[in-house]
Amino acid sequence: QVSNSISLGFCYLTLRQSPRLSKAQAQRIISIIHRSSLLETLPLDEDLITPSHEVLPGWSIPQGPENHEVPLPPQLTLLYHLPVELHTMAEQLKLRLATLGCELTLIFHDAKNWDGCRYLAQADMMMGDRLIGEAPEYTLEQWLRCDTLWPHLLTGAQYAHLQATLDAVQAQPEARSRNDALRN
């Protein structure tokens, strides 16, 4: 007997700030995803991918300014991995960005994580998902600490700062203190 169920998790899109993609352009792309009907147009089973304004339950996603005047780069590359539902999201994003003059090249990494992915250093954007499980804060901390994505996305100084911050969070004696520190 095979069981079908949907687990709580989150889909993420990370953007590498570089000469090809400025902070303002990255904010515009995030705005296109969160403030447009892009997520509602996904031809997926109901509730498989649903829009959210939270990273984890109770943790709001910071919203930058919506600026339609910021021109997008002429070309970008999106690297993404399983689950297969992200194929649909990637294709919809490609179509939406094309209407705005940005050609999005899609690269699919056929795995459930970034281990062994040789394109991480080249992509402008990376998309994947994480299951949350029983301990959302622990999941987030482990994702930030252990995922092979971060050393490719952050500078050495940024990555060292991230690790030092996570170490300081883990030094908190109580779970509530650790969770509060992780939020900040």
Language-model-detected regions and their locations in the chain:
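Pocket-flanking alpha-helical
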Residues: 1, 14, 113-146
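Structured segments of extracytoplasmic/periplasmic soluble domains
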Residues: 18, 28-36, 41, 96-100, ...
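Ligand/substrate-recognition segments at binding pockets and active sites
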Residues: 68-129
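Residues that cap or initiate secondary-structure elements
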Residues: 8, 19-21, 84, 112, ...
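Soluble non-cytosolic domains of exported or imported proteins
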Residues: 19-24, 83-91, 156-160, 172-176
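Extracytoplasmic/peripheral linker and loop segments enriched in polar/acidic and small residues
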Residues: 39-42, 46, 106-114, 141-184
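Short clusters of hydrophobic/aromatic residues that line enzyme substrate/ligand-binding pockets
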Residues: 52, 95, 140-144
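Local pocket/hinge segments that shape ligand/substrate recognition
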Residues: 1-68, 150-163, 184
